[in-house]
């Protein structure tokens, strides 16, 4: 197993993508701290991890707040005594609320946009801040954040979300430069359109259209994101840092060229 004796924090660890990451890291021997706002889902994930033969701790926190991120780290250290891996999965968008291409620039309300920015950019930054001193003291660690192809090629009617995910890439590169001397590697994964239960439920009629724009002709599976994360937190990627791994089936390649 690739992660024996490692301790991993997975924020959003009870969500669709986070669940697959949590289970895969557990199968590879990691002890898991599942940090999520959903207490009931957290408890279910603890049971799933135990069924896989590993240990787990559920921490109900909202990492948008720095004190909650610090609480998460303190709980992990109290239980396991070390943190080797941080995977920032918590994030997402409530879906586009603008009806035309220019509505974003005309509207005055700020609440929703600020919420998306805080959830998708400030929260991962808070978690990295909360854990970095411990990793520096141990002179080792791996941080992986989930970004999005929206941060690479943009997303129509998703200005705030795209900006936040692009910010994750910038955060990753900068933190990788600053933390390298302490043996800490920092990378991110940018999924394309992931076929979660929520996507199939909310937009079933759009899936054929999306698949036409993806070179491999299908949506991404959550397990494929988990596999990329496992690679980046394991010793198999020991010489990789500051990178954005795009897992999109060719979505970012765009339309056919000449």
Segments predicted by a language model, with ranges:
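Active-site helix of classical SDR
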Residues: 128, 164, 172
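Residue(s) in the substrate-gating loop at a strand-loop-helix junction
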Residues: 148
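Canonical Rossmann dinucleotide-binding motif of NAD(H)/NADP(H)-dependent dehydrogenases/reductases
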Residues: 3-33, 175
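Alpha-helical segment proximal to the catalytic Tyr-Lys
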Residues: 133, 177-181, 238
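Short C-terminal tail/terminal secondary-structure segment
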Residues: 153, 230, 241-258
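Substrate-binding pocket helix/loop in short-chain dehydrogenase/reductase
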Residues: 96-114, 199, 210
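A conserved structural motif in NAD(P)-dependent oxidoreductases
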Residues: 214-225, 236
């Amino acid at each position: 197993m690739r992660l024996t004796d490692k301790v991993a924090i997975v924020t959003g660890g009870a969500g669709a993508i986070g669940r697959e990451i949590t289970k895969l890291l557990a199968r590879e021997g990691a002890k898991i701290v599942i940090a999520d706002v959903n207490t009931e889902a957290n408890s279910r994930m603890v049971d799933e991890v135990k069924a896989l033969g590993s240990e787990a701790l559920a921490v109900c926190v909202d990492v948008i707040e720095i004190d909650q991120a610090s609480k998460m780290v303190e709980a992990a250290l109290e239980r396991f005594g070390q943190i080797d891996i941080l995977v920032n999965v918590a994030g997402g968008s409530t879906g586009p609320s603008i009806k035309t291409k220019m509505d974003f620039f005309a509207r005055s309300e700020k609440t929703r946009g600020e919420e998306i920015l805080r959830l998708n950019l400030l929260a991962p930054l808070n978690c990295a801040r909360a854990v970095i001193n411990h990793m520096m003291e141990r002179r080792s660690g791996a941080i992986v954040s989930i970004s999005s192809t929206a941060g690479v090629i943009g997303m129509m009617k998703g200005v705030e979300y795209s900006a936040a995910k692009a910010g994750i890439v910038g955060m990753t590169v900068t933190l990788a430069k600053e933390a390298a001397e302490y043996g800490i590697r920092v990378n991110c994964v940018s999924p394309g359109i992931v076929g979660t239960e929520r996507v199939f439920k909310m937009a079933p009629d759009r899936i054929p259209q999306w698949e036409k724009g993806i070179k491999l002709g299908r949506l991404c599976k959550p397990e494929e994101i988990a596999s990329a994360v496992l690679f980046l937190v394991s010793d198999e990627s020991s010489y990789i840092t500051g990178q954005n791994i795009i897992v999109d089936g060719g979505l970012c390649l765009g339309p056919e060229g000449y």
